[in-house]
Structure formats: structure tokens, C-alpha cells
From Swiss-Prot:
Residues that bind phosphate: 87, 125-127
Quaternary structure and interacting proteins, as annotated: Homohexameric ring arranged as a trimer of dimers.
Record has Cell membrane as a keyword: no
Broad enzyme group: transferase
Annotated organism of origin: Frankia casuarinae (strain DSM 45818 / CECT 9043 / HFP020203 / CcI3)
EC number(s) recorded for this UniProt protein: 2.7.7.56
Name under which the protein is recorded: Ribonuclease PH
GO BP of this protein: rRNA catabolic process; rRNA processing; tRNA processing
Catalysed reactions listed for this entry: tRNA(n+1) + phosphate = tRNA(n) + a ribonucleoside 5'-diphosphate
Record family assignment: Belongs to the RNase PH family.
Keywords: Nucleotidyltransferase, RNA-binding, rRNA processing, Transferase, tRNA processing, tRNA-binding
Length: 247
């Protein structure tokens, strides 16, 4: 089955990751997955939340948001509405959990890295793109801090689903909105699962289909890991002055 955008069922959208896109951040990356674009910025602060002080452990957290015209019709900013939606809270926590799976918080020391993931354009897979891009920003932030060894593995994420009875990788919005099953899978570079979120929208899926979807996701994440590795191969963007005033 050939999809509307010409891809095979097991094919990712074109993915690019541009590092250093936001020059004031200690680490940043603009990730594009098809038409979906997410800006991920990592900010380093000395110290940890009050409940973490004295533990010798660092902290990594994340916030997710979507620009008003990231979608085809305008959505008010949640700050204007006066409340953060449950979806936004859920995705922010998912990104944070995923990133903490790839870092040694003891090696980070009592420092905090906060990752802001802002969706510039949404065409499906925004949370998975955010995780994949946020990892790259996190690596550069750890390097900036002088603690590159705190990163112990990579992490990436991709969506899979069942559309018209067929398992598909990396769903665009038109596919996601009509899928019989929608699943988001977060994997480490060692093929470990960090999180699997899957829902049957109508017809339940069986164990055979579940295995097919997970196999697709693992292969997709392996390709994303290779893209992350290539993006991180170049020199570290200068960013703001490093601790001690040096760049």
C-alpha cells in the first residue's frame, strides 16, 4: 500500500535536525519530520528543586507547547486561557521521563536542565518529534556544562498505527486522525523501551498486530538514532558563555 504522501508503510517521513538553532540556549535543535517542526531548547541552571537538594543528583525536566498557528486553525495560547490542558501536561511529563532515561543524574551533579519543546508546525507526531529533537539539545547542554559523560544512551520516539488494516510507521495527521490504532513508542539506542502508549480507536488489535507495530517502531527508532548521531557529529555550537566565562 502506497500512502498519500508516497511513502511505503514502513517508511519514516524525511527527518532533519539542525543544532544550535536558538543561540541563547545551552543546547538547541530544530527537528523537522515531514511537515511537523518542533524547536527544542535546553537551559542549564545551577542547583536543583528544593526536594532534590543535598542528594547529589541532578534533574531534567521538560515543557511542551504549541504555537497558536501550528495547526490549520488558530488556538489560543494556554497562558491566555489561564490553564494548561491535560494533554500538554501529559506530553510534558512524557518528554521529561524519556530524557531522564538517557542520563545519569548523579554524573550531572546538582544541576538542572530544562527542555522547552515548542511546536512550530503540527502535522502529526509532535510529541515523538519533540523527544527525538530534545535528546540532541540535551546532549549539547550536557557538553556545555562540561559533563558529556552524563549521557549514557540515546533516546528517540516514533508513532506507529493501524490504518485501513495495515501497520504503518510515523503517521502524518491525516493518517493519525483516521487510524484504527495509534501508538507512540520511545526507545533507547540499545533497543530498550522507555514508554509504549497505544490505543485502539475502534477495532481492538491482537498480539500479532502489536508485535508488528513494535517491530516497526524499533526499526524507525534505529533510523532516528542514526540521524541524531549524525547531527551530533559536528562541532558543538558556541551558545552562551560557559561556566567560568570561557566559550
Amino acid at each position: 500500500m502506497i500512502r498519500a504522501d508516497g511513502r511505503r508503510p514502513d517508511e519514516l517521513r524525511q527527518v532533519t535536525i539542525l543544532r544550535g538553532w536558538q543561540e541563547h540556549a545551552e543546547g538547541s535543535a530544530l527537528i523537522s519530520a515531514g511537515r511537523t517542526r518542533v524547536l527544542c531548547a535546553a537551559s542549564v541552571t545551577t542547583g536543583v528543586p528544593r526536594w532534590r537538594k543535598g542528594s547529589g543528583l541532578g534533574w531534567v525536566t521538560a515543557e511542551y507547547s504549541m504555537l497558536p498557528r501550528a495547526t490549520d486553525t488558530r488556538n489560543d495560547r494556554e497562558s491566555v486561557r489561564g490553564r494548561i490542558s491535560g494533554r500538554t501536561h501529559e506530553i510534558s511529563r512524557l518528554i521529561g521521563r524519556s530524557l531522564r532515561a538517557c542520563i545519569d543524574l548523579k554524573a550531572l551533579g546538582e544541576n538542572t536542565i530544562a527542555i522547552d519543546c515548542d511546536v512550530l508546525l503540527a502535522d502529526g507526531g509532535t510529541r515523538t518529534a519533540a523527544i527525538t529533537g530534545a535528546y540532541v539539545a540535551l546532549v549539547d547542554a550536557a557538553r556545555w556544562l562540561g559533563r558529556p559523560d552524563a549521557i549514557i544512551t540515546s533516546v528517540s520516539a516514533v508513532s506507529v498505527g493501524v490504518v485501513k488494516g495495515e501497520a504503518m510507521l510515523d503517521l502524518a495527521y491525516s493518517e493519525d486522525s483516521t487510524a484504527d490504532t495509534d501508538m507512540n513508542v520511545v526507545c533507547t539506542g540499545a533497543d530498550g523501551f522507555v514508554e509504549v502508549q497505544g490505543t485502539a480507536e475502534g477495532t481492538p488489535f491482537d498480539r500479532t498486530m502489536l508485535d508488528s507495530l513494535l517491530d516497526l517502531a524499533v526499526r524507525g527508532c534505529a533510523q532516528l538514532t542514526a540521524i541524531q548521531t549524525e547531527a551530533l557529529r559536528g562541532p558543538v555550537p558556541a551558545g552562551p558563555p560557559r561556566p567560568g566565562g570561557a566559550r
